[in-house]
A protein has these predicted regions:
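Class I S-adenosyl-L-methionine-dependent methyltransferase catalytic core
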Residues: 1-137
Length: 137
C-alpha cells in the first residue's frame, strides 16, 4: 500500500484475509492515524509499516525476494511521476504471475505505463479513476 494515508485500503485487505500488508506513508499526520488504526484493529502482526517516501519503497529490505498479489498506489492527485515506481516494481520482480497494481488517480491524469503494464479495467467515480494493471509478459 504505497501512499497509504490512514491505511483504509490495506486494512480492508487484512479484514478480507491478506496475510501481510506493507504500508508506506511519510506524511506524519496520516502515519499517526494509520498507527492508531492498526492498533485499534489489533493487526500488528500482519503489518509492516514504513515512514519512507513511497518513491523509495524499492530500497526496503523486507520486500527483497517477495512476490505480491496486489500493489495499491494512491498518490496525491498532483503527483505525476509514478512511472518510476512502476519501473521499480518490475525491476524487483515484485508481482506474482497474476498479480495486480491498483492505481487510484484523478480522472483527468494521463498515465504513461503502456509499455510495462496493460490495463485490465479502469473505472471513473466522481473525480477519481481506479485502474487495474497487469504486467505485460
Amino acid at each position: 500500500d504505497l501512499f497509504s494515508g490512514t491505511g483504509s485500503f490495506g486494512l480492508e485487505c487484512i479484514s478480507r484475509g491478506a496475510a501481510k500488508v506493507y504500508f508506506f506513508e511519510n506524511y506524519i499526520q496520516s502515519l499517526e492515524i494509520l498507527q492508531k488504526n492498526i492498533k485499534k484493529l489489533k493487526c500488528e502482526k500482519k503489518v509492516r509499516l514504513s515512514s519512507d517516501d513511497a518513491f523509495n519503497f524499492h530500497k526496503n529490505k523486507e520486500l527483497k525476494n517477495k512476490k505480491l498479489d496486489l500493489i495499491f498506489l494512491d498518490p496525491p492527485y498532483k503527483e505525476e511521476n509514478l512511472e518510476i515506481i512502476l519501473e521499480n516494481i518490475v525491476k524487483l520482480n515484485l508481482l506474482k504471475e497474476n498479480g495486480l497494481v491498483v492505481l487510484h488517480r484523478h480522472k483527468k491524469t494521463k498515465d504513461n505505463f503502456e509499455n510495462i503494464f496493460s490495463t485490465v479495467r479502469s473505472s471513473k467515480y466522481g473525480i477519481s479513476k481506479i485502474t487495474f494493471l497487469k504486467l505485460i509478459k
